[in-house]
């Protein structure tokens, strides 16, 4: 595989998702990432299902090394400082002010390494009236207005994965790469800051654009209505998702697949504005038709007519999808102690080369000896060869 960030050294002082997700993005592209964790307990995500190797922890910690250090202790701080002196990037996702308490604030680390790109991830920003508040995924989704677009008012429940956590980490990685690019010209590092609140507000850009442009406050069904998106149950109990968008050819294809060319004779459904205005009636019509055939039958018909669709899979169905297999989307890893595991590879390919070689998440302090004196003498320690 192509490791476009090979030679880049990253120290991650992260917990849960945002910090670990940021460094995972860099590790997936070949960066050497050392995860600094508290001795004994490590990243709190480790213990979410008992033990210290939960699936929650595994999700965002592949392709990394782990060292157990308490930077409040002078002897551990010496090792930490050696890592910082040789690092390109430092990532933390503490509440504002806590990094300074554990001797990992920007000013101190910058004195050790002026080329260091220092990334600070927070819930609400480094200053301001909400800066000190605790924040987790749902908090950021709610504060940014995004959660209001997901929750069904008739049955208000938080749904879905930790989007705010993951997206904040991905934005952080994006900012880090920008600072590294600038450093090539200046020779100096930058402080990169991103908060979950800001990240999710930006991720929710469409809703704010509608607000500021036309005064529309979007709700859960605003975008699906305009994009003409539907989820429909089939005779077998499986579901299909359609996203018809604007081109009329897709609607003609759907009518052909349903063997219902007469659908356009109804003025409510004859045009895009009509279909949007009469969405509930259209969903009722489509729902009745789709319950007449099995999902596989519908998929074959929709493929033949070039209609934008996909089976609405359960997670356990996705690995069996023919395209997922073709793309080698799921890869196996092996840890000498924890055994075999499977994960989703990086979605990025470079010159057609996919990231198929993935190192398993490390056990707590697994690489203490390797980094006891700082970075190994080689330019970049190949974690993938080590775990092969």
What are these regions (language model features)?
Residues 162-177, 196-204, 246, 250:
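Mid-domain beta-loop-alpha active-site segment that forms a flexible
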Residues 1-9, 233, 317-388:
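Terminal low-complexity tails and localization/encapsulation signals of metabolic enzymes
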Residues 40, 124-125, 196-201, 236-238, ...:
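Glycine-rich beta-alpha junction loops
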Residues 169-189, 202, 206-212, 255-260:
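Oxidoreductase and adenylate-handling cofactor-binding alpha/beta cores
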Residues 228-305, 309, 380-381, 387:
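Aromatic-enriched alpha-helical interface/lid elements that frame and gate functional surfaces
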Residues 1-185, 215, 363, 367-388:
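N-terminal helix-loop segment corresponding to the beta1-alpha1 unit
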Residues 126, 153-163, 184-199, 219-224, ...:
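Conserved Rossmann-fold dehydrogenase catalytic segment
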Residues 154-164, 233-238, 353-356:
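Flexible glycine/proline-enriched surface loops and loop-helix/loop-strand junctions
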């Amino acid at each position: 595989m192509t490791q476009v960030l090979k030679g880049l050294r990253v120290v991650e002082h992260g917990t849960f998702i945002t910090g670990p997700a940021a460094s995972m993005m860099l590790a997936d592209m070949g960066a050497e990432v050392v995860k600094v964790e508290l001795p004994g307990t490590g990243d709190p995500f480790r213990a979410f299902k008992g033990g210290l190797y939960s699936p929650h922890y595994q999700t965002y910690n592949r392709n990394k090394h782990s060292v157990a250090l308490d930077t409040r202790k002078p002897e551990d701080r010496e090792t930490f400082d050696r890592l910082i002196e040789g690092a390109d990037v430092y990532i933390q996702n503490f509440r504002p002010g806590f990094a300074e308490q554990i001797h990992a604030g920007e000013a101190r680390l910058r004195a050790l390494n002026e080329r260091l790109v220092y990334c600070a991830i927070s819930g609400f920003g480094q200053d301001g009236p909400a800066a000190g508040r605790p924040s987790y995924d749902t908090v950021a989704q709610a504060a940014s207005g995004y959660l209001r677009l997901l929750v069904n008012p008739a049955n208000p429940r938080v749904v879905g994965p930790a989007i705010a956590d993951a997206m904040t980490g991905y934005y952080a990685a994006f900012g880090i790469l920008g600072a590294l690019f600038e450093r090539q010209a200046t020779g100096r590092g930058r402080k990169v800051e991103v908060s979950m609140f800001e990240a999710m507000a930006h991720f929710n850009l469409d809703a704010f654009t509608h607000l500021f442009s036309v005064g529309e406050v979007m709700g859960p069904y605003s975008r699906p209505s305009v994009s003409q998106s539907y989820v429909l149950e089939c005779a077998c109990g499986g579901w299909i998702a359609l996203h018809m968008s604007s081109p009329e050819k897709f609607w003609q294809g759907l009518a052909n697949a349903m063997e219902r060319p007469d659908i356009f004779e109804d003025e409510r459904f004859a045009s895009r504005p009509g279909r949007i205005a009469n969405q509930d009636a259209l969903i009722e019509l489509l729902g009745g038709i789709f319950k007449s055939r099995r999902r596989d039958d519908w998929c074959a018909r929709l493929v033949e007519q070039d209609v934008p669709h996909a089976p609405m899979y359960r997670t356990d169905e996705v690995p069996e999808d023919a395209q997922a297999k073709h793309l080698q989307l799921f890869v196996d890893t092996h840890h000498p102690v924890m055994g075999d595991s499977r994960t989703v590879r990086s979605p990025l390919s470079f010159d057609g080369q996919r990231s198929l070689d993935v190192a398993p998440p490390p056990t707590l302090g697994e690489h203490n000896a390797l980094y006891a004196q700082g970075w190994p003498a080689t330019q970049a320690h190949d974690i993938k060869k080590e775990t092969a």
